[in-house]
Amino acid sequence: MNKKFKQISIALSAVGMLSLVACQSMEQGTGQKASANLDSRSGSQAKGEVMFTWQGDDVLINGKFSGLKPNSEQGFHVHEKGDCSAPDATSAGGHFNPETKSHGMPNSGMNHAGDLPNIKSDANGNATYTAKLHGFAVNTGPTGIVGRSVVVHRDPDDYKSQPAGNSGPRIACGLIK
């Protein structure tokens, strides 16, 4: 009887642990949001607003930008530090890269978590941006982007040059809250 009680106790403990893990997973990615207001840096006129919404394993990113070079592409990244105080936004640090991967194409699995698709501006230097990515979370955890910064670069990211895609100066920066 004692052996059977022990087996039942172990089984119930395992079920309880699995339930806790399942509940934690369900809490994550169920609509948590963060946003950033980007201000001009490096003498540019660029600015924007970005919203991050966690949906399951993915994060939906929506943004609006102005003051960009007309009919062009700009690199766009989440950076490791939540600090945009430097005039050239170098205070934001490098690309957010919690898994120490090489720089690369977004969603390839072989990229920094902070590597985002380029922004494409219209003839007036405005852009509307939408992307759905994975590899990071909308929280303050080790893979979380809350408390970090998001940066627009002057030039397009080539997704191959190391360590940062050869995307030029940082022209706008905002803290992700």
Protein language model features and the residues they cover:
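N-terminal leader/targeting pre-sequences
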Residues: N2, G16-E73, V78-K177
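Bacterial N-terminal signal peptides that target proteins for export
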Residues: N2-L12
